[in-house]
A protein has these predicted regions:
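Non-catalytic C-terminal accessory modules of carbohydrate-active enzymes
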Residues: 1-143
Length: 143
């Protein structure tokens, strides 16, 4: 459900009603006039909201599930079951992490296996890649 809500507030989701919304299709509005107002659906005060940064955090850390922790990156996706997976690149402590998540069982949540540079990791935490410039991470979702 998180992705469903995330998609609903995404500015691009309003492209089909852009004539009503009337603000840039790529920014979050500070407010959208409600159904009691004569100009229902009209967006106002674009660029004055901190919503973009919060939505970035929600999307990357809680939907894609790539979170920085003290000892490394925690990989814990919560994605729509219809997704086959996704790829992401994340810089963390000067190291570039190339992350591939596959979802063969089409689950919403749960990690079956994490492989780091070809070796199976314990749990969902990818330890910091000290002394490396790049790290390859493969995550298989499942129970």
């Amino acid at each position: 459900r998180a992705y469903e809500y995330y998609s609903q507030i995404n500015p691009a989701a309003k492209n089909d009603s852009i004539d009503l919304y009337e603000i840039e299709p790529y920014v979050y509005a500070q407010n959208i006039l409600g159904d009691e107002h004569p100009q229902f659906g009209l967006g106002r005060n674009s660029w004055l909201s901190g919503t973009a940064s919060w939505c970035y955090q929600a999307g990357t850390q809680w939907i894609l599930g790539i979170r920085a922790e003290y000892d490394g990156l925690l990989i814990d996706p919560c994605i729509p079951s219809k997704w086959d997976g996704f790829k992401a690149t994340r810089m963390y402590r000067g190291v570039t992490y190339h992350i591939t998540v596959i979802n063969p069982k089409h689950v919403c949540k749960g990690v079956a296996k994490v492989t780091v540079n070809g070796k199976q990791a314990e749990g969902r935490l990818v330890r910091a890649g000290e002394g490396l410039s790049e790290v390859s991470v493969e995550v298989e979702m499942g129970s």
